[in-house]
Amino acid sequence: MKIMMSNRQGKTLAVTVTGPEHADVIVFSNSLGTDQGMWQSQVAALEQQFKVVTYDTRGHGQSDVIEQSSLQNLAEDVIDILDGLKIAKAYFCGISMGGITALWLGIHYPERFYSITVANSAAKIWTEEGWISRANTVLENGLAEIVATTHTRWFSHQFDYFNHALAQQTIQSLTTTPALGYAESCRALAHADVRDEIENISIPTLIIVGQNDPVTTVADGEWMQQKIPLSELFVIDASHLSNIEQSEKFTQILSHFILKIQ
């Protein structure tokens, strides 16, 4: 079921809900420059046993572009979706930008989540200067330059992304992401830093990192695992979009983690 929902700012978010009506809920949050379609392997594997909620992050897919966004805004969109769907509590899984969103939610809204999964992310991703520069470049020149090199960051060199349908679909979603939506997310990430707060996360936390990830590294994952009390760390032989490159392994790790909590 596809739903267009309003957030607290009156802007529209594109949401999809599948699975049994009264099952436990798991929410998936996409990475920068993608849309909710990136989770289709996980949705297919889990929708028989969970009520699965995916959504296009603001400025991506079919969701509205919202200017002057922050990490708090990205996270509060999730709370607005839960409230709109009358979901009291859920499991949450985010990758990259969705992963740091998970951290913020774990810090500020632990009562709304059974657990968070932080995939291919960090408590501080890249640098403020780097993100601001990228935002300005995209606004001036569009996304073509980003699209041309994105496979080198998203996928391992040995992964045949060219002949992988979902990988190609995900790259295509980057080409259709609004430049302003992408830039606003870059600006939000420029100021997103929860390093001083993640020790306060009190709910079970799964950290998944890609062995070959040049963006959010194994060291980033190890640092988070040391700081977050109830956390587990798994390293997957993949790059930045590990849920696509190693979809079965990713889903297996996530499912096992959730089953231990249920």
Task: List where the protein language model places each region.
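Active-site loop/oxyanion-hole signature of alpha/beta-hydrolase fold enzymes
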Residues: 37-44, 53-93, 252
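Catalytic histidine-centered segment of alpha/beta-hydrolase-like enzymes
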Residues: 238-251
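Flexible "cap/lid" loop of the alpha/beta hydrolase fold
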Residues: 100-108, 113-145
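Catalytic histidine neighborhood in serine/cysteine hydrolases
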Residues: 218-241
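Acidic catalytic loop of the alpha/beta-hydrolase fold
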Residues: 211-216
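Short beta-strand/loop motif that positions the catalytic acidic residue
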Residues: 201, 207-209
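Conserved alpha/beta-hydrolase catalytic His-Asp/Glu region
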Residues: 126-129, 141-199
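Conserved HGGG/HGGXW glycine-rich cap/lid loop of the alpha/beta-hydrolase fold
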Residues: 11-64
